[in-house]
Structure formats: structure tokens, C-alpha cells
């Protein structure tokens, strides 16, 4: 199968990211973040904007690649990096981090309920990303494998697989084509 033209013209990592994190997805995150901030502090909304969420995600991705011992070091005059400290102030970044949300907490189901979803907090975001992933056509020959995403955190979702190089982590199923 051939890829759609919109996918064939993706040349940069930013374009690839924007293919999955559409304006609709970013706007959804803006709405849920502002809603959560009002639920926490009725008199003072965080008032996050579309561009601030994009900047927050971008700086967070940058911080995951260029790692420093502490988050505040990115704004330090000696250790800091302009890709972070010129984009947003440290206090604003931490405020957005505190309130960023992907779902409406008022719709949560108790853990004892049979309808409880362990991924409730990110389920709407996962569903929106899945919609975009399903638009990418599948190749004729595919391989399915399970992959362990390594982590040292405590989570009921963490699994152990002695056959994998990283034994502990989150299990994900991977669909790979020949290309």
C-alpha cells in the first residue's frame, strides 16, 4: 500500500509530531487543563493557551533529551538552555505542569467498580492519538511483538518479562512493517 500524500510530505520531527498532536488534540488539552485548574482553584484559573501547551510539550520533550539534575536548572544562568529558558518562565512552566490534564476528573469511576480504567487519566488522549495512528495504512507484511518500555517507577501497570533486555517496565505491543 502507498502512504497518503499528507504523510509522504512529512520531513521534520516537528511535522511528524503535529501529524499526531493536531490542533484539535492541543485544544482538548487546553480545555481540560483549564477545567482542572478551576476545579482545584475556583477563583484563579491557570488560563493556559494553545501556544503555551505547545511550548510546554516542546520544552518537556527537550528536557527528556538534554537531561539536567533538576528541572529548575534549565532556567539557571549557568546551566540553563535557551531552548527552555527563552520560551517560558520557570514559574509558568511549573504551574502548567501542576495543572496539565487530559480528562475530566468528574467522570472518574471508583477503583472498585468493574468499569474502572487504570488509564482513565490519559484515555481521551490515547483515543485521539489512536484515531490518527489508524489513518496510516498498513503494509502487506507485518510483524507483531511485545516491547517493554523500561521504568523504575512504582505502578500497577508495570510488568516483568525475563526474556527481554529490559526486564521491568510497561508492556506495549508493536506493529512493524518491512519499511
Indicate where each model-derived feature is located:
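N-terminal initiation segments
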Residues: 1-179
Amino acid at each position: 500500500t502507498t502512504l497518503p500524500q499528507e504523510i509522504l510530505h512529512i520531513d521534520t520531527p516537528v511535522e511528524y509530531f503535529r501529524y499526531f498532536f493536531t490542533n484539535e488534540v492541543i485544544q482538548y488539552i487546553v480545555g481540560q487543563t483549564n477545567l482542572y485548574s478551576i476545579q482545584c482553584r475556583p477563583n484563579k484559573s491557570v488560563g493556559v493557551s494553545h501556544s503555551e501547551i505547545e511550548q510546554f510539550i516542546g520544552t518537556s520533550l527537550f528536557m527528556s533529551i538534554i537531561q539536567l539534575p533538576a528541572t529548575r536548572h534549565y532556567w539557571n544562568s549557568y546551566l540553563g538552555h535557551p531552548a527552555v529558558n527563552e520560551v517560558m518562565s520557570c514559574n509558568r512552566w511549573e504551574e502548567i505542569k501542576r495543572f496539565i490534564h487530559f480528562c475530566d476528573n468528574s467522570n472518574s469511576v471508583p477503583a472498585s467498580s468493574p468499569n474502572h480504567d487504570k488509564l482513565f487519566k490519559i484515555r481521551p488522549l490515547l483515543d485521539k492519538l489512536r484515531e490518527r495512528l489508524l489513518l496510516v495504512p498498513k503494509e502487506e507484511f507485518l510483524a507483531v511483538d511485545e516491547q517493554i518500555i523500561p521504568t523504575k517507577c512504582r505502578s500497577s501497570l508495570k510488568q516483568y518479562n525475563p526474556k527481554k533486555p529490559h526486564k521491568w517496565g510497561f508492556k506495549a505491543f508493536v506493529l512493524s512493517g518491512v519499511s
